[in-house]
Amino acid sequence: MSNKYDIFISYRRVGGAQYARILQLMLSQRGYRVFLDYDELKDGVFGKKIKAAIQEAPVFMLVLSKNALDRCKNDDDWVREEILFAIEGGKKIVPVNPDKTFDGIHEQIPKSIREITDIQNSEIDFGQALGVTVDLMITDRLKPVLGERASEKHKDEDGEAAQVT
């Protein structure tokens, strides 16, 4: 049985939503099945569906935009809950530092999620080098977990469909 999703994207809505949506688009164009709560949770059943999606996806991608972890000191913070669930589930965690905006782990971040500081960030350039940096992240971080895609389709600079194999 195959998973419904390859990648779950976790992000802080303020400061991270635009990065998460671009990552979802780029990864989907390359053949990955991506869960993004903004698109998937239209009916308001939040917690149960979030946890089910994290459980389904082998990769947990964490968008570390500026101040992304500031509210993780609160027990009821959803980004914190998502990170904890991914850690407990043994997911491959891929922190993404968009445009080098992440300002680091603060002392008030709970020890239970502090282990993400030991994981190397994937720095994604959301400017002209977007495609190149996403492809590098795929090669270095996703393919070892998810394997090769039979056909990874995405658009080249001209907007034409391109094939990467």
Q: What are the residue ranges of the model-derived segments?
A:
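A short helix-turn-beta junction within AAA+ P-loop NTPase domains corresponding to the substrate/partner-engaging
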Residues: 117
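Conserved N-terminal substructure of TIR/SEFIR domains
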Residues: 1-66, 79, 83-91, 99, ...
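Glycine-rich, charge-decorated loop segments at or immediately adjacent to ligand/cofactor-binding or catalytic sites
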Residues: 101-114
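Short acidic-hydrophobic, aromatic-tinged amphipathic segments that line or gate anion-handling sites
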Residues: 122-127
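Conserved phosphate-donor/acceptor-positioning beta-strand/loop module used by diverse small-molecule
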Residues: 96
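Glycine/threonine-rich flexible loop motifs
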Residues: 70-77
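Short, amphipathic alpha-helical "lid/cap" segments that border enzyme active or binding sites
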Residues: 130-139
